[in-house]
Amino acid sequence: MKFLLTTAQGIEDIAKREVSLLLKKLGISFQIEEKPLGIEGRLLLEAEKAYYVDEKGRKRELSISTYLNENSRLLHRVIIEIASEKFNGIEKDESEEALKRIKDFVSSLPVEQFVKVSETFAVRSFRKGDHNITSIDIARTVGEAIFERLSRFGTPLVNLDHPAVIFRAELIKDVFFLGIDTTGDSSLHKRPWRVYDHPAHLKASIANAMIELAELDGGSVLDPMCGSGTILIELALRRYSGEIIGIEKYRKHLIGAEMNALAAGVLDKIKFIQGDATQLSQYVDSVDFAISNLPYGLKIGKKSMIPDLYMKFFNELAKVLEKRGVFITTEKKAIEEAIAENGFEIIHHRVIGHGGLMVHLYVVK
């Protein structure tokens, strides 16, 4: 069976490693391709069936999609792939021609193998690129094709609000994917513990990628600008054995982080401190690792303050950091100057897609 797995752009390799480790526990054969057909933020998984023995000793098939939905920290969606196609030139096609190509393709697919006529269905769509059609156009066209195909076998049931089966259609540049979205309408990165929303909160998937890149060894971990606590909470949920510390300047966000940690059941695992990261050495004498989503200045409209903020922060960080730091920001020039000026070395850099922005991730020591 084939699955299309979605994640954040720029962390495909880390997500692939996580999925590989999860599937190895099942003892099955599988192959994972990063960026299938050149599309970032996607993995293509082909895996054999997995089985388990129930309490009565009977052999049962294990749902790989359910297993990944329940255990992955880095994936956004788990989609059973029906088919994919490269539509050369579709970005230049007029809307009528583009939609016809999509409808003809979907009409040729055996969608009846993935949904019963007695089951309700809906189509959710995603589009990225320069096209003359919208995601709404795609959802409507794919829905029509599926409805017409299923009509050969009975009367199809459409339920746009609470469907039993969700078809997911994606058109990214000139590549089209169609599959069954087993994750549902809410992406996996939207954690159920998030009861307080910081205006610039970090996706949990990216937080986990940062944790992986830190290569933690059980030492103390600090988020010096912890916001709503995403990194700290995700780390605590891993049952991390080391000390976990969060510093946040604004009381409103600190209380929000504590509310989130309480909802996640890990409040007792995290030490929260109200404080200013530019005076870091007043709160901690030393820390092994620092991981943080630094302020970009975009939400508050104060980008001019960022270079000075970063310079002061890294000056303080140099006094307490023992091993490695992992940081993301949109402000490449400001952070690189602060890193160099305060004696740190960049040992890894990559660009990640986050909330419509391309952010820079740095691992420093």
Curated annotation (Swiss-Prot):
Role summary: S-adenosyl-L-methionine-dependent methyltransferase that catalyzes the methylation of the guanosine nucleotide at position 6 (m2G6) in tRNA(Phe).
Quaternary context: Monomer in solution.
Chain ranges of the THUMP domain: 69-182
EC number assigned by the record: 2.1.1.256
Written domain comment of the UniProt record: Consists of an N-terminal THUMP domain fused to a catalytic Rossmann-fold MTase (RFM) domain.
The protein's name: tRNA (guanine(6)-N2)-methyltransferase
One biological process term in Gene Ontology: tRNA methylation
Subcellular location: Cytoplasm
Highest taxon in the source lineage: Archaea
Keywords, sorted A to Z: Cytoplasm, Methyltransferase, RNA-binding, S-adenosyl-L-methionine, Transferase, tRNA processing
Single GO molecular function: RNA binding
CC annotations in GO: cytoplasm
UniProt-annotated binding residues for S-adenosyl-L-methionine: 198-202, 228-230, 248, 276-277, 293
Catalyzed reactions per annotation: guanosine(6) in tRNA + S-adenosyl-L-methionine = N(2)-methylguanosine(6) in tRNA + S-adenosyl-L-homocysteine + H(+)
Organism: Pyrococcus furiosus (strain ATCC 43587 / DSM 3638 / JCM 8422 / Vc1)
EC class name: transferase
PROSITE patterns in the record: THUMP (PS51165), UPF0020 (PS01261)
Main subcellular location of this protein, as a coarse class: cytoplasm
SUPFAM superfamilies linked to this entry: S-adenosyl-L-methionine-dependent methyltransferases (SSF53335), THUMP domain-like (SSF143437)
Family in the record: Belongs to the methyltransferase superfamily.
